[in-house]
Amino acid sequence: MPRPLSATIHTSALANNLAVARRYAPKSKIWAVVKANAYGHGLARVFPGLRATDGFGLLDLEEAVKLRELGWAGPILLLEGFFRPTDIDVIDRYSLTTALHSDEQLRMLEMARLSKPVNIQLKMNTGMNRLGYTPEKFRAAWERARAAQGVGQITLMTHFSDADGDRGVDYQVQAFERGAQGIAGARSLANSAATLWHPATHFDWVRPGIIMYGASPSGVTAAIEGTGLQPAMTLASELIAVQTLSEGHTVGYGSSFKARGSMRIGVVACGYADGYPRVAPEGTPVIVDGVRTRVVGRVSMDMLTVDLTPVPTANVGSRVELWGTSLPIDDVAQACGTIGYELMCAVAPRVPVRAE
């Protein structure tokens, strides 16, 4: 019999979150970002909930091909572009749109033998300093791309570094406007945070990622209260044992937790080999039988332990929610010093996942 740990992907939540993005950016088309196997949710599992999008954004050619095999005939954007000339053959065969951020990529595209022009999103580096042409070099890149026989429609794009923070987006928008001055074409600037909080950046296409999965771009649950976003993943397990401790008794490796009095603890079938963060400290929230309580002791490879004081009726078989519809993933991530993105992507292959 399998362990009681499993993840559930909520198709209705995905559809709801896409609708939320449309409500925030009603005049823009949407690239629903499904990179990293849909942020750990599974590309095939999220497709039914997100198929009302205008396009999908991802990184891997294999995932792009999989989307085509699932029946998606609309636009697919390769957010990092391509890496070698043979990639362009796949782009051509499957009618993909690609980001283009360097002279090396442009040179490969100029030399490619294509059956039809490739639509590109020409990327400007407005301050993130990862990919793209600087504003000063952008026009020359655009003119070269426009002259290339293998290039079709050109959309202008950039990516924000601080749309969820205090610095905001104004300095990058100004850089973008400077570099794109006088250049015609659709624009794509807004990520999840900008989709929610910076409407002036919406333009023609927005690129929501984390909000498709119901989590906060800032990593703070309160920041998305009132948006209508819903968690798209629930990670749940059960208590597989209950121990009663006396004062001074310890729990787990390193004896890091010591009982201050008589108490019951529950042992949960979930550990760091399942993707739960080993660094989760005492106090990390968890839900047992619908009641919020806390992790105590170190997280082990296959198990973790929780305080049952607030849940006196809990016993073996009691349901445990590690994160999901009753416990925002950002609350868990914040306690662990990380972000919900990482927890989503870290769910291990050995965890059974189903969509509903």
Swiss-Prot record:
The active site is at K35, Y253. The modification N6-(pyridoxal phosphate)lysine is found at K35. Pathway: Amino-acid biosynthesis; D-alanine biosynthesis; D-alanine from L-alanine: step 1/1. InterPro entries: Ala_racemase (IPR000821), Ala_racemase/Decarboxylase_C (IPR009006), Ala_racemase_C (IPR011079), Ala_racemase_N (IPR001608), Ala_racemase_pyridoxalP-BS (IPR020622), PLP-binding_barrel (IPR029066). GO terms for molecular function: alanine racemase activity; pyridoxal phosphate binding. It catalyses: L-alanine = D-alanine. Gene3D superfamilies: Alanine racemase, Lyase, Ornithine Decarboxylase, Chain A, domain 1. This is Alanine racemase. The gene is alr.
